[in-house]
């Protein structure tokens, strides 16, 4: 592993093309913080998928739709195309309301994945299919595609991610999970940097935000949020005086990951900080990809540090790659069958024997891909959850 730092800070600070320069000077602010609201919902973990669909997914949609209607600056980010499919199937009236806010740019389709998958065990083909199937759904239902990888809770990150993400047209990635490390990753730090570029195995680069704070941060301190010292300190550590911060769902019964929404009072404080803040921090109610979009093309920003290497998690992650061995076996078997089925179908279509069965193959892919979720394939969910997982794995094998 190594970090390559390009010395261009002086040029960047005086360059008129830098987004931080123009926005900070125009606003009269010294720092800029992208506030990224999200509602982290584990599809399965200490509960099964039935509870997710019956309760947590419904609550998440209802609560955030209400906040979007009440607070004009609120922007909500939510990932996982499979969850949107379930909302459309089980709660079509909510899905139609979501469409409106997506069109307005205030409900952001983040993550660009069918499900927030573990990045280490799935094959590269599975990783790409996860993105492909999600983007096809988003384009069909919302007329847009997602732009980033949004994996706040996965258990370590392979260097192939920038390569695959860039190949799929994605421009950025964020996570808070590296803060869980017990040992430093680079020097005395758990992350290579707060904000910078990550280089993949083929040299492709995407922008990354690696110190966004916990995704369950929801109780903002009273007062002018634009004068908050914690936010200012976060921005001081990054190029151009910028920071990328998660905030989101409140805890349920002392535990997180149930979905939900940010606290209304915190959103009020953010709105006040945006419209009437007197402090040095310019607050942006942001989509998960806005930071990356603001800094493109990345070649114009040589001051951004570049990390080359893996970003593993050294705590519970190693055990995740050995637990629930049968689940991992079924997943790999489906990946092999999917590869064989795809090759056979393409040859048969090319030879004029039978048309390529896109719908049938996509259905089989989806049936097992969502179980590559970071608490499912990894073996960290409750026993009851795996009755659903194994069933889908077997059904997918039959379909392929």
Predicted regions located by residue number:
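Catalytic-domain carbohydrate-binding cleft regions of carbohydrate-active enzymes
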Residues: 25-400
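N-terminal secretory signal peptides that target proteins for export/translocation
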Residues: 1-2
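Bacterial N-terminal signal peptides
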Residues: 5-16
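Boundary at the C-terminal end of the N-terminal hydrophobic targeting segment
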Residues: 19-24
């Amino acid at each position: 592993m190594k970090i390559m730092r390009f010395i261009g800070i002086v040029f960047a600070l005086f360059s008129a093309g830098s987004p931080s320069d123009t926005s900070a000077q125009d606003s009269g602010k010294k720092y800029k913080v992208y506030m990224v609201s999200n509602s982290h919902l584990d599809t399965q973990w200490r509960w099964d998928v039935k509870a997710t669909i019956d309760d947590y997914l419904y609550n998440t949609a209802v609560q955030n739709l209400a906040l979007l209607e009440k607070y004009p600056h609120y922007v909500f980010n939510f990932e996982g195309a499979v969850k949107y499919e379930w909302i459309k199937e089980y709660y079509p009236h909510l899905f139609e309301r979501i469409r409106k806010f997506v069109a307005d740019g205030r409900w952001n389709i983040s993550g660009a994945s069918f499900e927030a998958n573990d990045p280490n065990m799935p094959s590269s083909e599975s990783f790409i299919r996860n993105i492909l199937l999600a983007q096809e759904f988003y384009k069909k239902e919302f007329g847009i595609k997602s732009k980033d990888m949004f994996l706040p809770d996965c258990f370590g990150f392979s260097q192939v991610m920038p390569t695959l993400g860039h190949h799929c047209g994605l421009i950025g990635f964020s996570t808070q999970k590296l803060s869980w490390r017990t040992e430093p990753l680079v020097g005395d730090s758990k992350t290579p940097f707060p904000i910078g570029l990550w280089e993949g195995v083929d040299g492709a680069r995407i922008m990354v935000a690696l110190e966004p704070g916990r995704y369950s941060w929801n109780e903002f301190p009273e007062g002018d949020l634009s004068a908050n010292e914690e936010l200012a300190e976060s921005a001081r550590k990054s190029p151009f005086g910028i920071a990328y911060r998660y905030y989101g769902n409140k805890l349920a019964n002392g535990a997180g990951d149930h979905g939900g929404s940010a606290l209304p009072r915190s959103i009020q404080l953010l709105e006040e900080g945006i419209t009437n803040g007197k402090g040095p921090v310019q607050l942006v109610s942001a989509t998960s990809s806005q930071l990356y979009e603001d800094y493109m093309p990345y070649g114009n920003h040589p001051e951004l540090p570049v990390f080359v290497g893996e970003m593993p998690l050294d705590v519970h992650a190693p055990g995740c790659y050995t637990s629930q061995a049968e689940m991992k076996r079924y997943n790999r078997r489906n990946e092999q069958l999917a590869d064989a089925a795809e090759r056979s179908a393409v040859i048969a279509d090319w030879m004029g024997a039978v048309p390529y069965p896109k719908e049938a193959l996509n259905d089989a892919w989806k049936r097992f891909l969502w179980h590559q979720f970071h608490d499912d394939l990894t073996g960290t969910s409750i026993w009851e959850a795996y009755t659903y997982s194994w069933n889908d794995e077997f059904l997918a094998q039959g379909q392929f």
